A protein has these predicted regions:
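Membrane-embedded alpha-helical bundles of polytopic integral membrane proteins
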Residues: 1-125
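Acidic (Asp/Glu-rich) catalytic motifs at the cytosolic membrane interface
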Residues: 56-72, 76-77, 85-86, 128-169
Length: 181
């Protein structure tokens, strides 16, 4: 019986990384969900999560839409060949701030910890972080020589493809709420 030491290390560290990457980062969604309003002892965390999802997903959609329409300059073609600087700068940031602002306008009374300035700043902060999350998942897929992270959702690329950017933006929103609200 022989043990392939290199493969064993890869499997071990891959398992540890997978655990940390998914469970630790996604746990911030639970922290946001139960983020308490000090003045009323109420939980409005679901509104913050919806805000996060809108900003993050509008960022992804805006980058894709603008990048597809006018994108010419590839961001990092060896990692994610479809991403362009035009999509990132114009689509990602505009859609993230716009989506967040629209949601905040509708549910402002439930989001006691955020002001208009916070919403605009978070849109500008979370949009690039969402892109980093998407690129990080692309790096993982490239290293595994996989096009998609799974086959459960045909045409979308897998569940990890849906939550990759949220995994990175959730901790940032939680820390922002914790330290600045």
């Amino acid at each position: 019986y022989s043990i392939d030491e290199h493969r064993t290390k890869d499997l071990f560290f891959g398992s540890i990384f997978g655990f940390i990457y998914i469970t630790v980062l996604i746990s911030f969604l639970i922290r946001i969900l139960y983020f308490e309003s000090e003045s009323e002892n109420q939980f409005h965390g679901a509104y913050y999560i919806i805000f996060l999802l809108i900003v993050t997903k509008f960022s992804d959609m805006g980058a894709y839409l603008v990048g597809t329409l006018i994108g010419k300059n590839k961001m990092i073609p060896h990692i994610s060949p479809g991403k362009t600087w035009e999509g990132f700068l114009f689509g990602c940031l505009t859609f993230a701030v716009g989506g967040g602002a629209i949601f905040y306008q509708i549910f402002q009374e439930k989001m006691l910890h955020l002001s208009w300035g916070d919403v605009l700043l978070l849109g500008l902060i979370l949009a690039p972080i969402a892109a980093v999350g998407d690129l990080a998942e692309s790096i993982i897929k490239r290293s595994l020589k996989a096009k998609d992270s799974g086959s459960i959702l045909p045409g979308i690329g897998g569940i990890l493809d849906l939550i990759d950017s949220v995994l990175f933006t959730a901790p940032i929103l939680y820390l922002y709420l914790y330290f600045f609200s």
